[in-house]
């Protein structure tokens, strides 16, 4: 069982140099920790692309990467993210308790209500995140 917790307060730029802060996480969103050097991120990318076509807001957290490599990676493979927060030193990732990439956080109104380490796939989506999303929708 996952104990919900507050999303850490932050102010960072995204990969396109726009300012992003905690307030960007309203409603239901997924925060996916990824990097251009991460092999498993490549594996989960098609599923994230499919997910991004749903009404779920998918936000990237580019982790310990170079902006240039990250932009090239998305340029080649497609960008499923509404925006991707640039976290070159891993500061926000550290505050979130990230141990590596990929990791995905389910966030509802700035509360982290779910978390998985490793690849997000259809099975984990259905068994872990969907019940939490349904519960969040029922309480709002």
Regions found by a protein language model. Give the residues of each.
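N-terminal "domain-start" segment that seeds a small globular fold
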Residues: 1-22
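Short acidic-hydrophobic, aromatic-tinged amphipathic segments that line or gate anion-handling sites
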Residues: 12-13, 83-87
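Short active-site neighborhood of thiol/selenol oxidoreductases, capturing the structured segment around
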Residues: 20-42, 48
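Hydrophobic beta-strand anchors of alpha/beta hydrolase catalytic cores
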Residues: 30-31, 58, 104
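Structural microenvironment flanking redox-active thiols in thiol-disulfide oxidoreductases
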Residues: 42-77, 88-94
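Short, conserved active-site loop motifs that form the nucleotide-linked donor/cofactor pocket
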Residues: 56, 82-83
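Thiol/disulfide oxidoreductase modules built on the thioredoxin-like
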Residues: 75-80, 87-136
